[in-house]
Amino acid sequence: GYVIPDRAGLSPEAQSRYRSAYCGLCRRIDALHGLRGRFSLSYDLTFLNILLCSLYEGETPADSGIDRCPVHPVHGVLWRSADPTDYCADLSVALHYYNAQDKWQDDHNLLALGYSTLLDNSTAEAAQRWPRQCNAIRACLAKLAEYEAAGSTDLDAVSGCFGALMAELFDYRQDRWAPELRSIGFHLGKFIYLLD
């Protein structure tokens, strides 16, 4: 991921909050999609998880605790999750699935094919819960493939395509926060595409 926290610049309290959101997202990915889904955990979706949980704090029940996991088998770690965390868990798996499918189609990468096969059922479940978002992922990747096939050098159009995808994903509920979330997602998506 590209949205990485500056841990040195975070207070101990902020570091703890970030880590609990990261671990909460990992835990929910595992609960919804199993251990294989945990490989889709990313800093980018952790950022979205923190953003959405902060915006909707108090509107949805939050859960927290201390648990051990495969990465931390000895000492338990603090985790925190809420409804937006499940949303981010589904998006994480779906994004990795469609990205792996894209790599298979472009490069015939066997690892990508294997990984996408592992995520087939999980992505189908995520697509049932979030059809608008999963359709946007598919449409964006198809449009990006068209740009690549045409040899497009229009960075604004190409990055704007990925920005539009991120705007759709950031717009969790299509509610009062939609304009701000879409703007953040769009501009962040353009930036991420240009970095990549």
Question: Predicted segment positions?
Answer:
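Acidic catalytic motifs of isoprenoid enzymes
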Residues: G1-S183, L194
